[in-house]
């Protein structure tokens, strides 16, 4: 089980690293249409993962509360939203295709704030992977080895385009290929760190697992609504983003049902 958790935590990070490696093979920055499609796909995966892999298991684990089984999921969900809202105000960052940075005023370089934006985005994904593996290691009936693998694979699939989305613009900003690659890799390092910390926290307070599952869901959905949906809806390719949102949602849903 420990070995399963190790690889489950590492797989999403490998997805980001492989995506960042696109900077060595693609000469030009990603076209707007491709960026919209990749962003929409990532958003679809995250929404499906939030529902099938996090919120539903959270309510199933609280089934002994009867009609109040929704309560832990609702509380954790709102705490996740508020946590990301707080980070959004505390960390200076710059979203893709945005001219104005968010968060406190900072003298950080534009490229650094772009990496910070993706790192902020990746925090809830690492927490999501960590909390499902915490449930798996604890022997929770609602969380299976196949289900945890489905979530890891789904996050890894959507991390691949994210790695490219950060490394290619860094290259377009004038950064050398090697540094742009490591910038993409660095943006994903928070995921395994967040996963390990979440596993440790869940191990200490196992009865709070339903709250932690829904906390991760709330944090992920905050990122989708605040960042990904606006990015995929800009410009002339918004329909493409919507179509690939549906593709990403379907892929993650199929993975969870087929493997879970």
Predicted regions and their residues:
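Intrinsically disordered, metal-sensing/regulatory segments
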Residues: 1-260
């Amino acid at each position: 089980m420990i070995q399963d958790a190790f690889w489950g935590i590492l797989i999403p990070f490998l997805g980001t690293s492989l995506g960042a490696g696109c900077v060595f093979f693609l000469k030009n920055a990603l076209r707007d249409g491709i960026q919209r499609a990749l962003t929409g796909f990532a958003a679809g995966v995250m929404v499906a993962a939030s529902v099938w892999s996090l919120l539903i298991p959270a309510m199933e684990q609280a089934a002994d509360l009867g009609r109040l089984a929704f309560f832990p999921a609702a509380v954790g969900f709102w705490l996740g939203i508020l946590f990301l809202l707080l980070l959004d105000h505390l960390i200076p960052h710059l979203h893709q295709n945005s001219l104005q940075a968010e968060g406190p005023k900072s003298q950080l370089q534009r490229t650094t704030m772009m990496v910070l934006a993706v790192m902020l985005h990746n925090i809830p994904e690492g927490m999501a992977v960590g909390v499902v593996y915490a449930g798996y290691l604890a022997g929770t009936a609602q969380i299976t080895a196949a289900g945890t693998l489905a979530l890891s694979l789904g996050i890894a699939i959507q991390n691949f385009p994210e790695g490219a989305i950060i490394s290619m613009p860094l290259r377009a900003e004038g950064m050398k290929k090697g540094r742009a690659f490591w910038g993409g890799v660095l943006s994903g390092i928070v995921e395994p760190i967040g996963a390990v910390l979440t596993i440790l926290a869940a191990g200490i307070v196992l009865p709070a697992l339903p709250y932690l599952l829904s906390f991760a869901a709330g944090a992920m959905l905050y990122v989708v609504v605040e960042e990904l949906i606006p990015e995929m809806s800009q410009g002339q390719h918004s329909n493409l983003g919507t179509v690939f949102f549906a593709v990403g949602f379907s892929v993650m849903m199929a993975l969870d049902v087929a493997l879970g």
